[in-house]
Curated annotation (Swiss-Prot):
NCBIfam families: hybrid_clust, PRK05290.1. GO terms for cellular component: cytoplasm. It catalyses: A + NH4(+) + H2O = hydroxylamine + AH2 + H(+). GO terms for biological process: response to hydrogen peroxide. This is Hydroxylamine reductase. The gene is hcp. Keywords: 2Fe-2S, Cytoplasm, Iron, Iron-sulfur, Metal-binding, Oxidoreductase.
Amino acid sequence: MFCVQCEQTIRTPVGNGCSYAQGMCGKTAETSDLQDLLVAVLQGLSAWALKARELDIIDHDVDNFAPRAFFSTLTNVNFDSQRIIGYAQEAITLRESLAVRCRLHDATATVDHPMAALQLAGNDIPTLLQQAEDFALDSDKAIVGDDVHGLRMLNLYGLKGAAAYMEHAHVLGQYDNAIYAEYHAFMAWLGTQPTDVDTLLNNAMGIGKMNFNVMAILDHGETDAYGHPQPTSVNVRPIAGKAILISGHDLKDLRMLLEQTEGTGVNIYTHGEMLPAHGYPELKKFKHLAGNYGSGWQNQQTEFAKFPGAIVMTSNCIIDPNVGNYGDRIWTRSIVGWPGVNHLEGDDFSSVIEQAQGLAGFPYSEIEHMITVGFGRETLLSAADTVIDLVAQKKLRHVFLVGGCDGSREERSYFTDFTLSVPQDCLIMTLACGKYRFNKLDFGTLEGLPRLLDVGQCNDAYAAIILAVKLAEKLGCGVNDLPLSLVLSWFEQKAIVILLTLLSLGVKNIYTGPTAPGFLTDNLLAILNDKFGMRAITTVEQDMNTILAA
């Protein structure tokens, strides 16, 4: 195997990347290699989707399937080799069906692409693993060099992140043909093994720009369905009663679960990136949406083991449920998979509910501990004039966006320490699961505004971008001239594409950590620093002094 897509990848003096029997995430070499083969098949499918569009053929089955299958290869999403093979088989079936449609329209229709006619060598895992060796992501690294390889990975992993957001938006009924056309173009292009550095850099920015549009339709999909988030207090301590825990990003799954558990006596708790759900009017109206349970995803093996109910994983992040001996209580949805655990097909949660009713539940209610969420796009925009007035009165010195992914690396304590060191005349915005490093702390208020503003999930970076643009317009300056600094933690591919989105929009001087992506060479990091001022975090004191002195 060779996988270098997440922050916890193995790093050695001779090179970075997981390349043994199992990756740091728990993904086996078998699953990793089969995912590489799936990616190659999906690149061929995208090549045919582009040809079809030339002939005015848009196959919605292909558009719906392709990003979803690609999403399954993200970190901590699907560890089930058989389901990865199933995606590859389905991709070939869709590709051949689309090719037939193209040839009915134009008998000479062909696609000149190295993956356009790729067939699986068999149905058994040993045969497919042998075939997958030809599609290892580092197969020609020694030939093209570390910089080209690193840029390919930047594009590939960024596109994976965008594909995940496309799937989240699709679940909510959002579709934009222009976005899907761009996605297929980038995916097919990556299948040609590009080597031109300038093209690779430009297309990475192109993927970032595309993702801004993806986040926009996802934002509208969520707010159209569930209303605009409102500041809402959330209890992070359990109450007595039967319980189901739901994790991931899929608000539609949460809505269905809430509807199906209403009146059953089962309380629903959010976990991880599902926390922002409590701010949506159409979700928080359910009285049995009891609160939020747990902390960052990396602690789930301990926290899920203690949860006395059923658990539903709607998207990333899942890790080995057998370690905490709760594999029989966890259920996967959609693209999520772990070998041997229950997988829910369709929209009927009755099996989960029945299991929860048969489990102990929480024996008593703990003393409440409330945190506040729900500072979404409309709420932020409504506060824009207040923020501007406070800046003008010199009552608000600076705004920090401290967010991104959480993880297990010890150095991530930086983000807790950083927020605690933010001066009292400054505000902190946060989003994504990195917030669990500090979101239960009391930061107080500034002139009536909470000093900690929870914007939402990782994709709600869109709301923060919209606020920054609006503030810049009102102040007659550029976004980079605002008293605003971004301090971002990364772990996986969604964070990569959000970084690309910010860079593509011209946002500069972003601080990132806890480490640089393992696929970015020193040369590439120097380019990003030179073009965008992107820099690695150092110490809290040094970074804070640098930011406030600017």
